[in-house]
Amino acid sequence: MAAALPPMLLLLLLLLLHHPAAANPDAKRLYDDLLSNYNRLIRPVSNNTDTVLVKLGLRLSQLIDLNLKDQILTTNVWLEHEWQDHKFRWDPAEYGGVTELYVPSEHIWLPDIVLYNNADGEYVVTTMTKAVLHHTGKVVWTPPAIFKSSCEIDVRYFPFDQQTCFMKFGSWTYDGDQIDLKHINQKYDDNKVKVGIDLREYYPSVEWDILGVPAERHEKYYPCCAEPYPDIFFNITLRRKTLFYTVNLIVPCVGISYLSVLVFYLPADSGEKIALCISILLSQTMFFLLISEIIPSTSLALPLLGKYLLFTMVLVGLSVVITIMVLNVHYRKPSTHKMAPWVRKVFIRRLPKLLLMRVPEQLLADLASKRLLRHAHNSKLSAAAAAAVAAAASSSAASSPDSLRHHHLHQHQHQHHLQLHHLQRPGGCNGLHSATNRFGGSAGAFGGLPSVVGLDGSLSDVATRKKYPFELEKAIHNVLFIQNHMQRQDEFDAEDQDWGFVAMVLDRLFLWIFTIASIVGTFAILCEAPALYDDTKPIDMELSSVAQQQFLPDIDF
């Protein structure tokens, strides 16, 4: 076995040495014949007036990025070139049936096709792949390239936007009389191709759907030259996939905007209304900072999402102002603010019914009692005045000794009235007069007894008041003062509750107003985007074989 090993190694070595000699000698001979006297700098025409027809195609492999801020579209493409070179024609029978030959592209003439709207990087293809030579003289060269083309971004409907970008290719050196450009799928004299970009090897983007890829040929005349310069526009219409922005921007923004409505549902006594408003305002500001990092810095248009955020910030700002006004109404006191009759009529009687609010029965009872008390007070004052006049007339008409005795008693009681009147002055009774004025008491409450019993409403006391001793009359005045003070305090508390209820009605009123404004504003702004009503199906899922293999379900035959 060991003796047989060297002959086997020798045989293997001979086979390896014989393998290069087994290469296609016809292809080598063809390569030498075609390129031995070939000049790659000369345009491949037999006559100098002839035009080289270059057919151009674009095969999209991947949509790498669309930078909205820098307005740059980055794509991974294969740029297909096809033209005729009369020097590369041969008879396959003379070269062992060879019909195609792969040669390095650096060894042959290449059209200087560049990307006119280049934004960054190389204008031309930098990866020099091999070209395919056909025996008919046709040359096919399909190099890969990564282009960064400028794309004008329209941010009006962001994030429900559609963008149309283009890639303009043309010869940088030769005019239209030397090199004529046409699309590789162009037929007859039609300069437009509906599907101008090959999407068979396209990897679907996670952010954009491709709606259309038309191509169109143009001829442009420059001031320097009389000849036309042809170019081909490859247009790409993109529609944004909105799931990411809906979940991460739209939904939180809508939720925060509706929190501004709940500010008016929060009771004023909680003390957190202003804090909630400021927190919502700060959240809206944070969203503005996030969007400013995404959208391009342009003053030509305001993004749709920016409009909505601005709308919500206006609502939140108004809610802060209105909340301050509502709190001011809630904490008003009768000692500083007297409620106007129209306020009581509008905000306690009318608006609660329209706003579906239940008015407390105590407020309704207080309103009714105040109306009855007002009418009764006016009638009692009139009756008391009439009784006082009658008593004065009867006392003046009396001429009996008893009348004279009562007259002297009346003078004695009048002196006591003067003493009581002295108590009402600022120097008397430690400021009782000032306390009475604070709670709305009149001088009659401490003046003559007719006015005091006039408030009590008892007409019999008017006739018999002269029989009261001074101590009893003073006690009656003190009791009436305490009664008047307690009545004023009850009215003070009742009106304080009225201000609180008015603030509650204002909260409910603006709750409805802001709810309707938020709903209408949300739908009016966000539903403005035309992409929401566009039911055009993406063509990348239909034309891409890669997408069909990845996303379409397997079909068992």
Swiss-Prot record:
A GO molecular-function descriptor: transmembrane signaling receptor activity
Cited InterPro entries: Neur_chan_lig-bd (IPR006202), Neur_chan_lig-bd_sf (IPR036734), Neur_channel (IPR006201), Neuro-gated_channel_TM_sf (IPR036719), Neuro_actylchol_rec (IPR038050), Neurotrans-gated_channel_TM (IPR006029), Neurotransmitter_ion_chnl_CS (IPR018000), Nicotinic_acetylcholine_rcpt (IPR002394)
Gene3D superfamilies in the cross-refs: Neurotransmitter-gated ion-channel ligand-binding domain, Neurotransmitter-gated ion-channel transmembrane domain
Record keywords: Cell membrane, Disulfide bond, Glycoprotein, Ion channel, Ion transport, Ligand-gated ion channel, Membrane, Postsynaptic cell membrane, Receptor, Signal, Synapse, Transmembrane, Transmembrane helix, Transport
Transmembrane regions listed in the UniProt entry: 245-266, 274-294, 308-329, 501-523
Spans within the Cytoplasmic topological domain: 330-500
Signal peptide location: 1-23
Glycosylation sites: N47, N235
Compartment(s): Postsynaptic cell membrane; Cell membrane
Cysteine pairs bridged by disulfides in the record: C151-C165, C224-C225
Coiled-coil boundaries: none
Domain of life the protein comes from: Eukaryota
Record carries keyword Acetylation: no
A cellular component annotation (GO) from this entry: postsynaptic membrane
Stated family: Belongs to the ligand-gated ion channel (TC 1.A.9) family. Acetylcholine receptor (TC 1.A.9.1) subfamily.
Functional note: After binding acetylcholine, the AChR responds by an extensive change in conformation that affects all subunits and leads to opening of an ion-conducting channel across the plasma membrane.
Name of the protein this chain belongs to: Acetylcholine receptor subunit alpha-L1
Organism for this UniProt entry: Schistocerca gregaria (Desert locust)
